[in-house]
Amino acid sequence: MGTNGTTCPGPMKATSNGVFQGENPLEHALPLLILQICIVLLLTRLLAFLLRPLRQPRVIAEIVGGILLGPSALGKSTKFINTVFPPKSLTVLDTLANLGLIFFLFLVGLELDPKSLKRTGKRALSIALAGITLPFVLGIGTSFALRSSIADGASKAPFLVFMGVALSITAFPVLARILAEIKLLTTDIGKIALSAAAVNDVAAWILLALAVALSGEGSSPLTSLWVFLSGCGFVLFCIFVVQPGIKLIAKRCPEGEPVNELYVCCTLGIVLAASFVTDFIGIHALFGAFVIGVIFPKEGNFANALVEKVEDLVSGLFLPLYFVSSGLKTNVATIQGAQSWGLLVLVIFNACFGKIIGTVLVSLYCKVPLDQSLALGFLMNTKGLVELIVLNIGKDRGVLNDQIFAIMVLMAIFTTFMTTPLVLAVYKPGKSLTKADYKNRTVEETNRSNKPLCLMFCFQSIMNIPTIVNLIEASRGINRKENLSVYAMHLMELSERSSAILMAHKVRRNGLPFWNKDKSENNSSSSDMVVVAFEAFRRLSRVSVRPMTAISPMATIHEDICQSAERKKTAMVILPFHKHVRLDRTWETTRNDYRWINKKVMEESPCSVAILVDRGLGGTTRVASSDFSLTITVLFFGGNDDREALAFAVRMAEHPGISLTVVRFIPSDEFKPENVRIEITEDQLCSGATRLIDIEAITELKAKIKEKESSRSNSDSESHIIYEEKIVKCYEEVIEVIKEYSKSNLFLVGKSPEGSVASGINVRSDTPELGPIGNLLTESESVSTVASVLVVQQYIASRPVGISKNVTTEESLVEDSESP
């Protein structure tokens, strides 16, 4: 109701009739809301782009963007604030922002698996408790200083609890994002940080519920008790009544099948109903959505499907509105005078001191190294959206005034902003191994030293698994177990849309805190099909495949591959080609980013690298089957890469189901290279030393064939290895020879073959990473084959960075690499 000297703004109509009928669209709710959303998205995305080189999470850009649109910056202009964010429009903006926040808190609850808290190690639990207790105590101490100065009149008990929660909270979604950005998500320190943050999150929400119950306007202690007890009753009702119903829905959503739209609508309806109940009780509506997320079953397909459907709309559209709604309440200008700025420094110091010192001391007591302890302290000091939620609830309930609210928002920005640079400064994992530590960087060296072969297979999706399994089976040699070590790395993109819950689901196979490790058959059937496939292979072949996960932006995921290869002392990394074969046998690009990854790994890998051009190697998976057989052909021209391909093929030939043919090309005296070609350089011609090593490799191969023939003299079986020499006069004869072996299952070729025959081959191609022979077998119409191709590059410490010199490119790889 209006009073003398004041007027209440009238309600806004939803839509306008347009400017041509004399109406201003900005005086109507819908067009004004659209303008607000566009401005918010444009500003926050621009700030996120500017902060990307500093490796800051997007939440920093969104908080700063909200502040810039508020009274601290652009909002100082009366014309701007009355035009774009007039007071009468804020109810619609706040309602839409809080609706999105309800669903975001549901996603936050989905991140937490209560079962994982039971399995949290003593070390992570101790670190979490220390990271809560000391900051909470310091927060209470800080609140006394604030109440005696700038917060005089604030309710004592609610103010103490709100300040304690604000200083002790760790923003789990932001922490997960930062860990992934700095490549610590799957490390030991990342596991400890996530486990501790999970415990911290649960404790913080319980304390927040208590603070909300205490902060009712004019409420008596008895009323606060009723609110708190009603909240406890709501949680019990959700656990014993709502959760069984949701589990029934989840069981009706089997893995690999689309989720029924009705189930999604029912679940979102349950989230809204729970929010209504908690708001009706007197606890904030967000609490109900969070509880539903916590009790939601994490196994199976349903949780992932919900995240996929809700994530983009919530994080991309609704959440930035909440940051603006918060920024409109933040006025940095209220922090005036030495006293106020001194209190800001005090709040920041206590927030950092409590979290960092508490975490570091307990970590050192748990025998965590000093650099990791410091990194954990900085990581646990991460604030973010959850911090803003606590502060906004406190301000809306009158517990925090404008000045304290601004101080706490600046504290949240500062502590989060400093996390990444400080962690990178104190913790530098992944030191390169010395040559003495890591000797067998190639298959050729491994065979020579008679050591177990270590391979790393990278894959993009389950589509790659059958071929990988068949290639592993072919590589196991005679002794199935001790002579082969295999790592399978799943390449997953960390994109802008990846929420913490998606990342948690992606890395749960590595044993992070939100993975149900129950090994029952029911859980196994609903777990990741990739892990199931490798587990089945292990049981049948007795070759252990260790799953790994790389979660990074496409522009830097090659660093994960190279670092993992060095850490595991791998002899060869095998990468999938960036194209796949369609049913009509034509090539289709899976994703051009994978081509960039292959190029960068070839340049920076600490071991040999191979690119697998898959045309369905061996058909369907036939592990440990008596009819497992592959016909493999090595096209040998000479040089380091060809010898590495030969060494890998000889290793495969130890398998009883493998038939290997080695074809060596020898130029005749009148050999003529192809007419259209580029200049031949010395790098393409075998040096005398290289030629001698090639001859030695061929001599060893002949001796091996002779040994096999003598060992089989008492049987009618033939040798599995055939060596042939082909004397060629020109490029066309090379093509004709290759055609003779077009029915092979697999070709092994070097990326950069050497010698006069190889130097005479000129192939125009847009995939120079395959080399001339790989391109000939893959994309040239001269050779028609359905065989898969493995293009091998041997590790050489002094290998120059760049593409193969005997491939004429029609487009530059560097241009393609600009997109990631």
UniProtKB/Swiss-Prot annotation:
Induction: Up-regulated by NaCl, K(+) starvation and abscisic acid (ABA). Induced at acidic external pH. InterPro entries: Cation/H_exchanger_TM, CPA2_transporter, Na+/solute_symporter_sf. Disruption phenotype: Decreased K(+) content in roots. It comes from the Eukaryota. GO terms for cellular component: late endosome; membrane. It is a multi-pass membrane protein. The chain crosses the membrane at residues 30-50, 58-75, 90-110, 124-144, 159-179, 192-212, 222-242, 276-296, 313-333, 342-362, 374-394, 404-424. Its main location: membrane. Predominantly expressed in epidermal and cortical cells of mature roots but also barely detected in leaves. Belongs to the monovalent cation:proton antiporter 2 (CPA2) transporter (TC 2.A.37) family. CHX (TC 2.A.37.4) subfamily. Operates as a K(+)/H(+) antiporter that controls K(+) acquisition and homeostasis. Could complement the kha1 deletion phenotypes in S.cerevisiae. This is Cation/H(+) antiporter 17. The gene is CHX17.
